[in-house]
Amino acid sequence: MNYVNHIAYWESGETIAEGAEIPPCAPGDFPEVTYDLERLKSDLNRFAVTQGPASLWRYAPLLPVEEVDNAVTLGEGWTPMLPVDRLAVAMGLQTLLAKDEGRNPSGTFKDRGASVAITRMRELGIKTIIHNSSGNAAGSWAMYA
């Protein structure tokens, strides 16, 4: 986690120790990652990012994981932006692009979050995961777990 300052619960503000397993939180609360933006600005530039792999993991320095080599990946991310010309005209816009997240492994944008979350959980040694979902997230997390 090169640029992570800390992880804390959004509502309570309780900080989670680096490398620690994230304990359960109160309903409606969730862990939030805070970055060292000054160091990030001085170290990372657009060119460095473009040299990464053609996937979500090109942004690894910005993700809350220890090592990109630990990535649990099925090729998520790097989905195309497609022109939606007729809708653009109907909306009075010169150009309109739509992100085609259906090209992700499970057909949903949720693969991005599942890949990062499962990667971090594996880094922490978490071997059992319970995820409550009645939709796309369940399929995505099942693929990555």
Which stretches of residues belong to each language-model region?
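PLP-dependent amino-acid enzyme catalytic core
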Residues: 1-145
